[in-house]
Structure formats: C-alpha cells, structure tokens
Amino acid sequence: MAASDDSSHYFTEFTLSEIVDMENLYKELGDQSLHKDFCQTVASTFSCSVNRNGKSSITWKQVQIWFQEKLKHQSQPKSKTLPSPPLQIHDLSNPSSYASNASNATFVGNSTFVQTRKGKASDLADLAFEAKSARDYAWYDVSSFLTYRVLRTGELEVRVRFSGFDNRHDEWVNVKTSVRERSIPVEPSECGRVNVGDLLLCFQEREDQALYCDGHVLNIKRGIHDHARCNCVFLVRYELDNTEESLGLERICRRPEE
C-alpha cells in the first residue's frame, strides 16, 4: 500500500504557541526558513521552553518538514472546490499551562454577551490572549486554548474557551485574524502614548449590550491632569458599526507594542 501523503502527524508534535511562532517566522523568511541551521535553532528554542515541560523534544527535521509543508500549501493553486475537512485536531488542554482568571463577562438570555470593563495592567499576568467571537464580532479574553486544526488551505484555527464562559460558548476562530495578544488598559500616566490613528480596544456601551470592539482614534482632547486621574477625551470610530463616540480613558485599551 502506498504511503499516505497526509502530513498531519508532523503538525501534531507542535503546541499552538509554537505553530504561531513558526507562522510568523515563515511570513518573515519564506523559503529561507528551510535551512538546516535555522531549523536547528528553532527546534532547540522550542525544546528548551517551559511550555514543553512533560512533552517530547522537537527535532530540527520536524521543524523543517513543517516549513516544507507550509511552502507546498502556499505554492499550490487555489482550488475551486469546497475546502476539505481539517487535517487534524490536537488536544491542548493543560491546566498547568493555561491559568483561568476571574470572570470578566456574563451570559444573558440566549444570545447576548455582556462584558465588564477590564482591570488594571497589573491584572494581566495570567491572561495573555484575546479572541474575536463570530457571534457578535467583539473581543473576549481567552481562558484557554483547547484544540487546534490546520485546514488543507494552510489556515490555522484554534478552539478557544472565553474567560467567564463555559464550554457551551467555545468557538473555532482563525488564528491569523481573530487571535491576538491581549490589549492593555491605559493608565492615567500613559495617556500620552495614545495618538490619532491608533487602533484601540474600546468598551462600547449600548442600551442592549456592552462589548469590547476595535476602534480608531479620530481626535484627542487632552487635558491637564496628574498621574492618578486622566480627563482626556478620545474620539473613536468603531470598526464594528462605523459609529463615532467620545470616550474617557477608562473605556479604552491600547494594543501592545510590537
């Protein structure tokens, strides 16, 4: 019997964070990522990571094969048929790796999410990511990554559990477009770091819902204040519905610096 060309067994050796790292490396380096020396460095870095405690080490060959498969998928012409089922699903549940945080959201009725405002930056130690829900296109803190799958199109999806919600509200989300490092609440002493044109995560309060949505800064009315209280006003336009609103510092979070 001919050997299967399904390469999913190579992908299942990696954790989600390792795949995200390799996605970014491939985006920067392209086919240069196939070089043996580079793959050895990546494999050594992954194997020495604390996230690999209790897991087998990664070999440079596994890393190289991952990049080869990525390059192959990128080179293939787009098919006109519907995408095939996912290549694999891998269990990432690990209580020691992903710490749950106190509830920052509640579920109301059958379909309405209601979020509370984020805390201080010092509260972010255990929650590193946020994900965008397909239900309302709002961003929620991620409590844990449960499984992931690599589609035949090469896209990576992960199943997330949102902080403050149970497994009934778990979702598959696209890693590239709907998962990112958690936004950071802006302290009064940091308001000068927010500029016109910046992308912010904004707390949008409406009569029927309260959501965290992306918005761009259109204008800033800066006031004189001390490090303990900020009276600046930020005019933002929400990406969700293209409406504009003036917000105080307590209703905005900045994106981490790259």
UniProtKB/Swiss-Prot annotation:
Zn(2+) binds at residues 191, 225, 230, 232. Disruption phenotype: Loss of DRM2 controlled DNA methylation, but no effect on CMT3 or MET1 controlled methylation. Residues 138-244 are annotated as: SAWADEE domain. It is found in: Nucleus. Changing residue 130 to A: DNA methylation defects. One of its GO terms (cellular component) is nucleus. GO terms for molecular function: chromatin binding; metal ion binding. Keywords: Metal-binding, Nucleus, Zinc. Gene3D superfamilies: 2.30.30.140, 2.40.50.40. Changing residue 141 to A: Strong DNA methylation defects. Associates in vivo with Pol IV but not with Pol V and this interaction is not dependent on its H3K9me binding activity. Glu-130 and Asp-141 interact with the H3K4 side chain while the H3K9me1/2/3 side chains insert into a hydrophobic aromatic cage formed by Tyr-140, Phe-162 and Phe-165. The SAWADEE domain (138-244) binds to mono-, di-, or trimethylated H3K9 histone peptides, but this interaction is impaired if H3K4me2/3 methylation is present. Involved in RNA-directed DNA methylation (RdDM). Required for the silencing of some endogenous RdDM targets and accumulation of 24-nt siRNAs, but not for the production of Pol V-dependent transcripts. Functions in transcriptional silencing through both DNA methylation-dependent and -independent pathways. Required for both maintenance and de-novo DNA methylation. Plays a role in the recruitment of Pol IV to genomic regions associated with K9 methylated histone H3 that are targets for RdDM. Associates with the RNA polymerase IV (Pol IV) complex. Interacts with NRPD1, NRPD2, NRPD3, NRPD3B, CLSY1 and CLSY2. This is Protein SAWADEE HOMEODOMAIN HOMOLOG 1. It comes from Arabidopsis thaliana.
